Regions:
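Intrinsically disordered, low-complexity polar/charged tails and linkers
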Residues: 1-23, 38
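Small-residue-enriched alpha-helical segments and adjacent helix-cap loops
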Residues: 2, 26-189, 219-221
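Short, flexible, solvent-exposed loop/turn segments with mixed acidic/basic and small polar residues
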Residues: 15-20, 51-57, 205-208
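Short glycine/proline-enriched loop/turn "hinge" motifs that connect secondary-structure elements
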Residues: 16-20, 111-116, 239-241
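A general secondary-structure signal for short beta-strands and their flanking turns/coil
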Residues: 21-23, 151, 242-244
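Iron-sulfur cluster-binding cysteine motifs and their immediate structural context
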Residues: 193-212, 223-244
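A hydrophobic, small-residue-rich beta->alpha segment in the mid-to-C-terminal subdomain
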Residues: 242-246, 251-254
Length: 254
């Protein structure tokens, strides 16, 4: 069957054109890259009912479902209603009746109103990782209602620490969780584990004073990674409760 397809309109609806004529790939938003496992049933149902039975973990942490025929897009959008309501509207607090913060009623049977700001990606952060300085998922969900829905082609990556596993340096807005450390000399046994960790994995700002057996720090070049905290066997280094972030602008490569 031949169709006169408005490809731009399909893209705004989060359906990417395939190299196969008349087929599209749905991109389901997953802000921060983590949702309840129950939502995998949505992916499975769409892939097996209207797609080709496969899905791809998108490079921006979306659920990308391939092989959807153009004529099946309305049915897919109608099925997506509950997912969008629960993940974007309820979990992230997105006002779906606005676009770029201007009133625009959303038709819940019509799928995503815009592709706009791309899905916010995040590493696992301190939800799981011993290196994480911040809860990346919570931050992503706070940012989501600020940038979505909109027509701005913005990419935001969140990294939980300066290791930058999520490549915050390579997007429009990169956010990196950093920490300020507090030294507790009364707990320090002078083992030098933190000095070695900083020398090997960070910026060599720590040194062991042989006279006092305590650690000295040159704060000028500390990147806030927290490697000293991770290495210390006696908790002589701890992260301060206040959260800090390094924001990087204009690093997008694609």
């Amino acid at each position: 069957m031949n169709h006169d397809i408005n490809v731009k309109k399909m893209r705004l609806n989060c359906f990417r054109q395939s190299k196969v004529p008349g087929e599209f790939m749905l991109q389901m938003r997953v802000p921060g890259g983590m949702v309840d496992a129950k939502y995998l049933s949505y992916v499975e149902h769409i892939a097996n009912t209207w797609g080709d039975g496969n899905f791809h973990f998108g490079t921006r942490q979306t659920f990308d479902i391939t092989g959807i025929k153009y004529e099946n897009i309305p049915a897919v959008n109608e099925y997506l209603e509950q997912y969008i309501k629960e993940v974007d509207a309820e979990l992230c607090g997105v006002n779906m009746d606005t676009v770029a913060h201007e009133p625009q009623p959303w038709d819940p049977k019509a799928g995503y109103p815009t592709i706009g700001a791309r899905n916010i990606t995040a590493c696992v952060g301190n939800y799981h990782c011993i290196c994480g300085n911040c809860n990346t998922f919570e931050l992503a969900r706070k940012i989501e209602p600020i940038i979505f829905p909109s027509h701005y082609h913005i990419k935001i990556n969140i990294a939980g620490c300066p290791n930058d596993c999520n490549k915050a340096h390579l997007c429009d807005f990169g956010i990196i969780g950093v920490a300020r450390m507090t030294y507790h000399p009364e707990r320090c046994i002078g083992c030098g584990a933190c000095v070695r960790a900083c020398e090997h994995g960070a910026t060599r700002v720590l040194s062991l004073n042989e006279g006092t057996g305590k650690i000295e720090k040159d704060p000028c070049c500390c990147v806030g990674c927290g490697e000293c905290v991770k290495a210390c066997p006696t908790s002589a280094w701890t992260r301060q409760e206040t959260k800090f972030y390094r924001v990087i602008l204009g690093g997008r490569t694609a």
